[in-house]
Amino acid sequence: LVAAFPKRPMDLHKYSAGTVTIVGGSSHFIHAPVIAGLGARAAGAGLVQLVVPDASRLATGMLLPEATFTKQTPACVPPRADVTAIGMGLGTSQNSELLLSRLLSGSTGRFVLDADALSLLANWYARKTGALPISEGQSLILTPHAGEAARLLACTPDDIQRDRLGAVRRIVARYRSVVVLKGPHTLVAAPGRDDVFSCEAGNPFMAVGGMGDLLSGILAARWAYLAKNADGDPFTAAASAVWLHATASDALVNANPPGDPSIANTAHAVASLRVALERS
């Protein structure tokens, strides 16, 4: 996986480093997309663009001043990007469904779907007997935890945990997407591949709210960078992002003395590890 972090060329600029747009947030979940933005910046995105409600604007300015801001509405047009991450704190209201449906059905590109976007995707599948609002030419990465995976497969979280390998393969087959099944030894699987990546790094201190949002931003940034500077393979992007996130957290909690495994500190640890890899 170290090969997924090539040395940065001297003539790199913010657009060739990869651009990421993050669509999320609601009045109840103000900070989720901002956390994803922190992950994207830590993982090396050259430009982070947030499409969030007004309620998230202050948090964006305070926590991620380098990001651009677009007000989120059902009819908004998110800035174009190499990768768009959708769902963190978005909610499952009718307006959220309209926005997600319009983004997925009206454009081609690379999309990371997390959190509420996964619930909406599962609802569409159940309602329309497999018809999904996905256009030809799109490439998707889904990032469910066990509960979200259960919704995607219409089963229970216990069913997922009893057979995580089988579950990740079933989600891949049903939704024709790369899938990151989060949890102990996070799994990454992709259409057309028999192998499944299992991440051996990680620790129980990662079990805090917002850690999944951070990973979604990290994943979007790595995919955007590889799309600009390598072959852009989504499986490689997903596996390398999962590894980077977990390994950085391990370095933090295993330090002497141990570091505080907060979201902000984990983002800093991700940035430090990523820079060390990309300058070697």
What are these regions (language model features)?
Residues 1-115, 119-141, 146-280:
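Small-residue (G/A/S/T)-rich helix-start motifs and N-terminal tracts that mark the onset
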